[in-house]
């Protein structure tokens, strides 16, 4: 038996009875990539308004007696609703669906059916899978490439069918019905039982599907195909938005356009050319800056070499600079008798360091320098360099190096 959400995708609330409520746990994504386990209950209802994940469509969100439902999954012919508050079996409850989320899923899913059918009808492009993402939807097509002309033709055709206000209907067929053979589909779940649910766009397509759909293509409003990307081997991914997502995308795009107009001091039609000019100017400045930095590194190396303080341990810190700057200095000095400790970056924060000198000394001291600076590094052939998080401890490194040199001199 189909759930109420499948029989009437436009229903927003209804009353039903709790069948069971059992302790359960739910693993969520939490913050970032860290998994979080929530303790709660799996609630089974006589019928449900909340769609359980399936057919490429995410599950619904909503409430049962104002208690938030955090996940809905299908288990055979029933739906499990995860809540963090128990509900009494046998009690009547009011179920409400998060309509904004539901209607968005209806628009995207019906949009996918329409694009899949039109791509096949016009160009024989078969759909092998699809994904209803949080920001965009992806249809995987069984073709190594899709031309811009094909994309434009598909988009024009699907939007014409939306303007034609074609009805969308749902019906159920028995497994032995000969018509099942004429229906588009990618197979049924292993635990499927009962009749086959078929979604039909009048005159366009009939497709096996368990998801929630609009009852008329006019509810899709519009479909925008953003383009295609290279997919898996010999596959192409077609990226699209339907309905309210197109409006939100236009709002974001218009906001970005206004911001760029203000920053670049030119109209939207000149944005690309203005950015190209900025990129070229930046590349030239970076090239000039690099040449100046190299000249400065050579001059700094000669200054250090001719300094009265030359010998033993020589240190230098500059706020501006990079790894190449330090290596040029080390190359110019080329001394294996002196320990050279160079750093660049924030004096009290993070930065880069380089230790150069006798191979044996550098191999011994390099890891210890990284440890003092609370950083990481690696080295070979008389050099050890890396990243540091505590440049404020440079004086401790200098003391460490001087102690080492003094000890070596005493032993000699």
Swiss-Prot record:
PANTHER family named among the record's database cross-references: ALANYL-TRNA EDITING PROTEIN (PTHR43462), ALANYL-TRNA EDITING PROTEIN AARSD1 (PTHR43462:SF1)
Designated name of the protein: Alanyl-tRNA editing protein Aarsd1
Protein location: Cytoplasm
Family label: Belongs to the class-II aminoacyl-tRNA synthetase family. Alax-L subfamily.
Co-factor binding details: Binds 1 zinc ion per subunit.
Keyword terms: Cytoplasm, Metal-binding, Phosphoprotein, Protein biosynthesis, Zinc
Keyword match Zinc: yes
An annotated GO cellular component: cytoplasm
Residues bound to Zn(2+): 109, 113, 209, 213
Primary localization class, coarse: cytoplasm
Organism: Rattus norvegicus (Rat)
